[in-house]
Amino acid sequence: MRRIGIDVGGTNTDAVLIEEGKVVRAVKAPTSEDVTSGILDSLQRLGATGVLASGRIDGVMIGTTHFINAVVQRRHLTKVAALRLGMPASASLPPFCDWPEDLAELVRGGVWMVEGGHEYDGRPFMPLDEAAVIKAAHEMKAAGLRSVGISSIFSPLDPSHEKRAAELVGEVMPGASITCSSELGRIGLLERENAGLLNAALADLARDTIAAFERAIRNSGIAAPLFITQNDGTVAEAGQARRLPVYSFASGATNSMRGAAYLSGLADAMVIDVGGTTTDVGQLRNGFPREANSVVKVGGVRTLFRMPDLLSIGLGGGSHVVLEPLKVGPLSVGYRLLKEGIAFGGSQLTTTDVAVASGVLDLGDKRKVGHLDSATCRKVFAKAASMAEEAIDRMKTEAGDVPLIAVGGGAFLIPEQLPGVSRVIHVEHGDCANAVGAAIAQVSGECDQIFKDMTRRDAIDAARTIANDRAVAAGADRRTLATIDSEDMPLAYLPGNSVRVRVRVVGDVAAG
């Protein structure tokens, strides 16, 4: 298969062509403020090398910062109607109750709370008040709202009330964008509801962004399906990503970790991804990033997404360097490195300037950094290594030395030996590991649900079937699906041999 992987970073937009498992060509383009033109630029640079003319492209995989930027920067968000099924319970904590006020003001289009929902064991808490749902939908329509987030108590156990409410709202508001929380989160009403509301707020941006990506691909003369990378290191076809954009919040660092695993051939290792501004440290398990088990805040909003467990520090190739007293980062010149770095005619001393002065990098004009002696350079590199060492130690989950894969454009800051590390692996094409990770990504499906009145084996099989179906819906080839994570927990306080099962599967992208 021939695939193009693109990853948008804070400094560069990287693009690679992978054919039959090998990196054929890699290019970098400056990240543009609107992101999309940077992607088009990277595709054009890749095409200019001539490698795209020799055969069909099977897919273009893009990792984008559009959606997380919209939430963090409070821009391009749509007003959302929040419909919660749970009355008379849950009234004391209405939708948006734990949001930052500035973000809530932007997104909150109205709140409607009606009877419905289920108990913790799946029994109906209250019958769904369909008349109240229809009345709410008419009020939403009259208010000019076109995006709706629906949540229901314990909907991951039984999503039937959410689905029925979505049908009723769709009949009153044809063409509206409707998000059901049961599609997004796990057990935990507020966090799951928040995920649904954020997703609904991104509906218009997701539609416009993915349409722009598809235009960029067409304008580059490439006839290939578009896939968007997700938080867990997998991809979803464009239609699925358009419907569930929140799954693509934190794909950049995840892509780098997947790319590191692919380029090194290691499935279990620590990974340090040194970019232009920040360094991300995480751990690979079975070739995928270890997931965070805690609540994840996105733009100040509590959610329960599938997110990688990462530690970020202010160290990168564009980090500011202060010599007296010695300080590296957290400020960075970012994508302005080629203008502001001393080696390129600017006035700001950066880690890249130090690397040029010491001969580690052959960039810019070495004469401009001739005032940096070898002792000074060694001190700066030692400081950077100390920062990396501390971050790695904080992310390790077991005693002893572990292998470390160093990737990213700033990987020159990581020395060949570090305390607590058995070996440091610098891989070919490591500076574009993020784009490689996007290009080789598979498709995933997950189920996290409580089952009752069945054996443990039947519950696990049922969860696996649901996860498989979700993966296929996201664009996976059913024949290639494999389970990469499975856990079950008997719930003694619930009737009917209740067991909570979480299963995650991955598979290759379906051909065609």
Question: Where does each model-flagged region fall?
Answer:
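N-terminally biased helix-coil "hinge/interface" segments that flank
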Residues: M1-G512
